[in-house]
Structures are given as structure tokens and as C-alpha cells.
Amino acid sequence: MRLFLSLPVLVVALLTILEGPGPAQGAPEAVDTSTGLDKLKEFGNTLEDKVREFFNRVKESDIPAKTRNWFSETLQKVKEKLRIES
């Protein structure tokens, strides 16, 4: 009885193994991989360009100078208030 049950199970297991990988498990094609890498590289280059443009725009703008002046003025006001109260 054991041989009668184990033989079909063995045949099914061998057929499954010899069938090979299914479509979802197959190795990705080289074209798909290179296309994916090209898209990733393009995304990286685009991101790099946008970040460089952002930092250049910040360097050229007067925002850092205004911020520095605002902090300096606020610090001076706080120091003056502390001197008056002391």
C-alpha cells in the first residue's frame, strides 16, 4: 500500500522539478534589466540636476543673508532685554 501511494507522489514531484521554473519565477531578461537600470540612471541624473539647481538658486538668492540678519537682530534684542532686566 505504501508503494502504491508513494509512487504517484514521486512521479508528480519529478514532473514538477523537470518542468522548470514558471513564468513568474523565470530569470529576468537582459533587456528588462538594462531598461530598468537605464530608467534608474535617468532618475538619478534628473534628481541630481534638480538638487544642484535648488542649491544654486539658494546660493544666489538673498534668503541666507536675510536669515542671518534676522537672527542677529533677534539676538541683539534678547541681549538688550536681558541687560535691562539685570
UniProtKB/Swiss-Prot annotation:
InterPro entries: ApoC-1_sf (IPR043081), ApoC-I (IPR006781). Apolipoprotein C-I is present in acidic (APOC1A) and basic (APOC1B) forms in P.paniscus, P.abelii and P.troglodytes and perhaps also in baboons and macaques. The two genes for ApoC-I arose through a duplication process that occurred after the divergence of New World monkeys from the human lineage. In human, the acidic form has become a pseudogene sometime between the divergence of bonobos and chimpanzees from the human lineage and the appearance of the Denisovans. Pseudogenization resulted when the codon for the penultimate amino acid in the signal sequence was changed to a stop codon. GO terms for cellular component: high-density lipoprotein particle; very-low-density lipoprotein particle. This is Apolipoprotein C-I. Belongs to the apolipoprotein C1 family. Pfam families: ApoC-I. Residues 1-26 form the signal peptide. Keywords: Lipid transport, Secreted, Signal, Transport, VLDL. The lineage of its organism: Eukaryota, Metazoa, Chordata, Craniata, Vertebrata. Inhibitor of lipoprotein binding to the low density lipoprotein (LDL) receptor, LDL receptor-related protein, and very low density lipoprotein (VLDL) receptor. Associates with high density lipoproteins (HDL) and the triacylglycerol-rich lipoproteins in the plasma and makes up about 10% of the protein of the VLDL and 2% of that of HDL. Appears to interfere directly with fatty acid uptake and is also the major plasma inhibitor of cholesteryl ester transfer protein (CETP). Binds free fatty acids and reduces their intracellular esterification. One of its GO terms (biological process) is negative regulation of cholesterol transport. It is found in: Secreted. GO terms for molecular function: fatty acid binding; phospholipase inhibitor activity.
